[in-house]
Swiss-Prot record:
NCBIfam families: PRK04151.1 (NF003167), purO_arch (TIGR01922)
Keyword Hydrolase belongs to the record: yes
GO molecular function, one term: IMP cyclohydrolase activity
EC number(s) from the headed UniProt entry: 3.5.4.10
Pathway: Purine metabolism; IMP biosynthesis via de novo pathway; IMP from 5-formamido-1-(5-phospho-D-ribosyl)imidazole-4-carboxamide: step 1/1
Superkingdom assignment: Archaea
Highest classification ranks of the organism: Archaea, Methanobacteriati, Methanobacteriota, Methanomada group, Methanococci
Family: Belongs to the archaeal IMP cyclohydrolase family.
Species annotation: Methanococcus aeolicus (strain ATCC BAA-1280 / DSM 17508 / OCM 812 / Nankai-3)
Record flagged with keyword Hydrolase: yes
Reactions performed catalytically: IMP + H2O = 5-formamido-1-(5-phospho-D-ribosyl)imidazole-4-carboxamide
HAMAP family (UniProt xref): IMP_cyclohydrol
Disulfide bonds: none
Name the record gives this protein: IMP cyclohydrolase
InterPro entries documented for this protein: IMP_cyclohydrolase, IMP_cyclohydrolase-like, IMP_cyclohydrolase-like_sf
């Protein structure tokens, strides 16, 4: 099944909070996830930078760390949400203001913007589509995670969209998410785990 770009948020079997973001793409598969020099941001970049002239939505920061909080999204709203978190807005408010302001992507598919904000004790998922907007706190339970995608599964459901993720560090979780055969067209992945410190990994 093709569900496009998606986020996975939850806890590992050993109780570490994590969030993963996977790019799945039919149109622009030649992309990579790159961690910046200060180890607090992951960017999605095309292998050929000229591709950015063909589509403005294919390059963006997908993960950003602000203090003890991780912001993960499928677009440039990562930075907008992160700025609100820096200003110490509550997570719900930071998500709501940012998603309303940015709105869905104005591409051929009206692609929804999806987002997760995570810290050691709290996880929120949110999205804005052309006909819907929602923000919801989701429970963090050891060994359980939830996914939210741009297509087919753009809804927040802890009952029907849950997944047991294998892995304890960012690289292992990235590999699991990339290899997850139920969802087609994997391109690249980025993961943040919280275990005292926040660690980043890509694949």
């Amino acid at each position: 099944m093709y569900i496009g770009r998606f986020l996975v948020v939850g806890k590992t079997q050993q109780g570490k909070p994590f969030v993963s973001y996977r790019v799945s793409s039919r149109s622009f598969p030649n992309r990579k996830a790159v961690i910046n020099n200060t180890n607090d941001t992951v960017a999605i970049l095309p292998n050929d930078l000229n591709d950015m002239f063909a589509n403005p939505y294919i390059a963006y920061n997908c993960i950003k760390i602000v203090g003890n909080t991780v912001i993960a999204t499928n677009g440039t709203h990562t930075d907008i949400i992160a700025d609100k978190i820096k200003l110490e807005l509550p997570i719900r408010d930071a998500l709501a203001l940012s998603l309303i302001a940015m709105d869905y992507e104005k591409d051929d598919y009206n692609t929804p913007r999806i987002a997760v904000v995570l810290n050691e004790n709290t996880a929120y998922m949110g999205y804005v589509a052309d006909n819907d907007i929602r923000i919801k706190e989701v429970p963090l339970k050891d060994g359980l995670a939830y996914y939210l995608s741009t297509y087919e599964c753009c809804r927040i459901s802890t009952e029907h969209q849950n997944i047991v993720v294998d892995g304890e560090n960012p690289e292992e979780i990235c590999k699991f998410v990339m290899d997850y055969e139920k969802f087609e067209k994997p391109v690249c992945c980025a993961t943040a785990t919280i275990d005292g410190d926040i660690e980043l990994g890509t694949l």
